[in-house]
Amino acid sequence: MNSELSVPAAPARLQQAAAPFLFLLLGTVFATWAARIPAIRDAQQLNAADLGLVLLCGGIGSVLSFPIASFQIGHFGARKATLQSGAALLSILALQAWMPTPVCLMAGMLAMGAAACSFDVAINAIGAELEKAGGRSMMSMLHAWFCVGTFGGALLGSVLAGVQLDVHWHFALVALALALPLWLAFGALPHDAPDAALGKRSFALPHGPLVMLGVIAFCGSIAEGSIGSWSGVFLVDRLHVSDGVAPLGYAAFAAAMLAVRLVGDRLKERFGARAVVATGALLAALGVYGTVAAPTVTLAVIGFALTGAGVATVFPFMFSAAGRYGAASLAGVATMGYSGSLMGPPVIGFVAHHFGMAAGMLLVGTLNLAVAAAAAKAKALD
């Protein structure tokens, strides 16, 4: 990706809003899907293991998407890759609720995982270049807009589930509402040149100082992905809440994550990325353990909020650090992180099926402790 950015002719406000909107779009799609997982599970008559297998397909799709992301950025640049993968993501979301069988749902998740990860890599490549061009930390703020999307999407999902709007209409309306803004954001993004070197590369795991970043990204993102996929099911199955209340756990998680990401860049400048990520991971572990022990819905939701606050800086600081090593390094680390966020939920599903939902959530808390230990030693973060 060319570090010299030229700005296309577009209104100044639209130029400034383009990159934040792309992160908001991704968060909205995630939350829209997550908010209706209980309804889709019931419609397809899936048990915890079956649902875990469906979610595993999303993880597989994310892992397989690296060659797609590399091809797109290498041949078209991150700007065009954003439009291509974003349009695919919205189309797949609209179709997901129409999948007639679990097998079709798995195929849809495979495609959704690939499209979402390709979109994520592209917009973070854009964010890293904007950060580099501006000479200041801004990745946490960009990821805060992802949280705005997840929070808004979760609240909208709660309202629409509460009024019993059909999932088919819910997904279709969200996809349609985001399509035009995606096109406008694409038109306002800074032009970039294709990265020919990245386009010729095959998949390669992070190496050298990036190994620890990849491990932190993988383990840390399991918590974020697992809360998105299982928080509603946890509240329904363990505390017997309604489908309208179920998305509130994820809404609290997203709101707390948003609050921390709004000040994340300042925390990084004052304390350093390693200290912020390590401390946050400890807080996230405390939140998960508190949620499992919570006897009431209110306390469980507070636990989800603490978890969101704790994991808030993992992704933005990981992307920022990897971006300093170039687009190829960012894509490799991002793929490991994205694999964790999408492969974690099915693992939690299998654990929940055999040992109970509480055991699955406890695993998430333990992984956060591992992130805290690893982050304290990851010099590449700073």
Model-derived regions, located:
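Helix-loop junctions at membrane interfaces in 12-TM secondary transporters
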Residues: A97-G108, V292-I302
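Structural signature of the two symmetry-related core transmembrane helices
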Residues: K80-A94, A275-G290
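Helix-to-loop junctions at the C-terminal end of transmembrane segments
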Residues: S65-A78, A161, V260-G272, A352
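Cytoplasmic helix-loop-helix junction between adjacent transmembrane helices
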Residues: G108-A144
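Symmetry-related core transmembrane helices of the 12-TM Major Facilitator Superfamily/SLC fold
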Residues: H168-G187, A359-K377
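Short amphipathic helix-loop junctions that connect adjacent transmembrane helices
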Residues: A35-A49, S229-V245
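A late C-terminal transmembrane helix in Major Facilitator Superfamily
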Residues: Y325-L367
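Conserved MFS/SLC helix-loop-helix module at the cytosolic interface between two early adjacent transmembrane helices
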Residues: L64-V103
